[in-house]
Design a protein with these regions (language model features):
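Conserved small/polar residues in nucleotide/adenosyl-binding loops
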Residues: 96, 256-263
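Nucleotide 5′-phosphate-binding alpha/beta core
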Residues: 1-95, 101-245, 253-254
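Terminal presequence/propeptide segments associated with secretion/organelle targeting
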Residues: 23, 263-264
Length: 264
């Protein structure tokens, strides 16, 4: 299976190689796209996005905004207003732990952001992994994707607020469900103790080749799985495990958790 799926990633691998020394140009292109997309929003009109050209003009005319300065605009978006900071209606909001004033922040997650940043970034990570590991059999088994939970946003239709990982799982390509565990219903359980037990039981008898998620959460799930299975080492449960994709924390924390996983 991996040999067949690998071909899907080949063209992107070539693009990534081509772009290795084009960081500045790529970032300028992204900025131009963002300005063009948002020019008819309230924020875009207030800051003359329609006539704005380039990075220098952007930095000269757009102040650095704190979350608190944008909070009123985000609250209006959460209540269903359109064309405020981004065109159309933004339905999803990632809830982050509050680092200022002990209050949570709600980060708008647009459909374009999901497609062009989060999912594309995940695709690119797999593309680079396959390129660097020609003997990989990662698609010959299952992917354990660990996420948080979400809840209705002000009871607005189809609008959700919660962990970014839960929003990603909720909107994932249905084809990914063919190789992903746990079931969506399990993945989105809000009580983590119940969730980690169910995931551990669901995953321990599957041929898992790769895992994804916040390292501290993943370690908790793996610890529970080892308790239930009675095994000493992770490879005894998943002999074909080869990759841990992670984010959400500082890289050195991820590496520390990876080492703990290896030791189990």
């Amino acid at each position: 299976m991996t040999g067949v799926v690998r071909k899907v990633f080949e063209s992107r691998q070539l693009e990534l190689e081509k772009h290795q020394n084009e960081g500045k140009a790529l970032q300028e292109a992204v900025l131009s796209w963002l300005i063009a997309e948002a020019k008819e929003t309230e924020f875009g009109r207030n800051h003359a996005f329609a006539t704005m050209k380039g990075y220098d003009e952007f930095t000269k005319n757009i102040p650095i905004n704190t979350y608190e300065e944008l909070k009123d605009s985000i609250d209006r978006m959460r209540h269903g207003e359109t064309d405020v900071l981004w065109p159309g209606r933004v339905k999803w909001y990632a809830k982050s732990s509050g680092t200022t004033n002990d209050k949570s922040k709600f980060i708008p997650v647009s459909r374009e952001g999901l497609k062009r940043m989060h999912y594309k970034g995940g695709f690119d990570a797999v593309a680079m992994y396959l390129q660097n590991n020609p003997k990989s059999r990662i698609f010959d088994g299952r992917s354990l994707i660990l996420g948080g939970s979400h809840a209705p946003n002000y009871n607005l239709k189809d609008s959700l607020v919660g962990d970014l990982s839960a929003i990603l799982i909720e909107n994932i390509n249905p084809l990914a469900n063919l190789v992903r565990i746990p079931k969506k219903k399990t993945a989105l359980i809000s009580d983590f103790e119940i969730k980690r037990d169910k995931i551990a039981r669901e995953a321990m008898n599957k041929n898992v080749t790769n895992i994804s998620g916040v390292p501290s959460w993943m370690l908790s799930v793996l610890t529970r799985m080892m308790e239930i299975s009675g095994k000493t080492h992770l490879e005894e449960v998943w002999p074909n495990i080869e990759m841990f994709f992670h984010g959400g924390v500082e890289a050195k924390i991820g590496r520390a958790v990876q080492q703990e996983c290896r030791d189990r």
